[in-house]
Structure formats: C-alpha cells, structure tokens
Amino acid sequence: SLRRKLLSTTTIGSLVHIGYNSFPEINSKIVQVCAFSAHAARVPEFLARYVNLNSAEQSANKDDVFLGRTAELTTSVHQEIFSKLPGSPLVYWLSEHFLQMFDTNSTVSDFSVSDGQNKTGDNERYLRCHWEVDVRSIAEKSWIPYAKGGPWRKWYGNVYLVICWTSSARQHYKKDKIARLIPEYLWYRDGVTWSFITTKDIGFRYLEPGGTFDVGGSSLFFESEDLVYSMLAMLNSKPATTILKFLNPTISLQVENVRSVPVPVFDMNRAA
C-alpha cells in the first residue's frame, strides 16, 4: 500500500538501493535498505534514476561504490510501469521489455482454479505417512495422498503423507471450527503443487489425481491434463522464477503470487 501511494501521488526523483550489509553492526543479509527522494506531485513520464549498490559485499564499501559508480550500476526508469505490476514492486533492474509482459499477456489466473485448502484441525489424528496405513485403505479411498509441501524439489514428489478420507472424517473437516474441506469439484484432481515455504528456491511439482492438499502444499488446477503439464513447465522456467522472486521476495509463496505470473502466447497443443 505504501508503494502504491508513492507511485500514485508523488514522483520518485532518484533511489539508491543500498541493499544487503547496510549496517556495520549487522553486516549480513538480514536487513535491506534504500534511500530515495520524491517530488510531492505527479510528473508524468518523469525518468527517475536508480542506483544499485548491492555489488558492495561489506557495508564499509558502500560509500566508495556510490561515489565511483559506473554506468552499469545506474538505471533510468519511468515509474508508471511499476504501477502495472501486481503489488507495485520497484523492480528497476529488470528490462522494460520484461516488465511489459504483464501488459501484453494473460496470467496464470486466466487458466487456473483456486478455491482454498484443506485443514484437518487435528493432524495427529487425521494424517499419517503412507507406509503407516494398510495399502488397501488407500485403494479404497479411506486414506488418500496429501500434498503438504516439504523440501525443495521440482517436477514430482514430496507426497508421502495420507489424510483420513472416510465419510466421518470429511464431516469433521466440514463442521469443525478450525478444519476446512475444499469444494467437492476439486477432489482427486491433478494439478500443480508447490511448497508454501520456499527457503532454498522455488520448485513446482505435478499433483497426481486421486489426492488432495493443504496450504503447505498449495495447489492450482486447470481445465485439462495437457494444460497442467504446460503450466508446470512454464512455472519451472527461469523467467517465471525471476518474476515470482520480485512479486514476493519473502519465503512464503502465496497462491495469488503464482496466479499473477504472465503466460506467454504459445500453442498449448504443442507445449510440454
């Protein structure tokens, strides 16, 4: 909201991205800092200057890098382009062509469905590792595979849990004040899943049909199996990873961030 207010009511004149290692007493990547000047009025098409000091490894070098900065450290950008991005991030280091993808393409939200996540309200009672239950009960859908995130991994895997899926268990998920059950039209569908907490990197995986998921294994669903594979390939690409890292630079990858990724125009019948 602060960024949106700045972009809509002021004009950024210049911004120095001090970045990591800004404080000698910390001297780490815990805190990032920037300094900027702004005019208290909107000046359309004003070309602001942005200076990136992240190349300095130690805080003591920041002054030297700024005073001796080269052209490679300075970028000029019209701030109007930031307002078109989800969350209005000031990603001055990306090319204008890259940023214009949000203007000229559809996004994942145009092709996907998201309608909440399951929540048991009592994981000790309703969740098991798949080897802890009789395999016949999984075949009979008394227990079904349950995507709940896990360590970084691309393409496939990390589904080692099962959730109790008996009629009485589902009634509990519906009625309990803490628990939640996703709508029936999403039961057992294949899709794309990922770990909500992304401490290492971002990795998307195929969610097989016959299972379900919770917020730890956030998931999206699509109209066809071919589209699932196409979107999985696109989301695991380097451009998509770059976009997601500036849409949400934290370790918690939200569904809304993934659905905001622009989708290039391509033939879905030939993709993947």
Q: Predicted regions span which residues?
A:
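Short beta-turn/strand-loop junction motif enriched in small, turn-promoting residues
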Residues: 20-23, 152, 199
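Signature of N6-adenine DNA methyltransferases within the class I
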Residues: 1-137, 158, 168, 172-175, ...
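Short Ser/Thr-interspersed hydrophobic loop/turn segments at strand-loop and sheet-helix junctions
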Residues: 147, 185-203, 231-245
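Contiguous C-terminal substrate-recognition/catalytic subdomains in enzyme active sites
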Residues: 132-185, 193
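Residues immediately flanking
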Residues: 40, 149, 196-197, 222
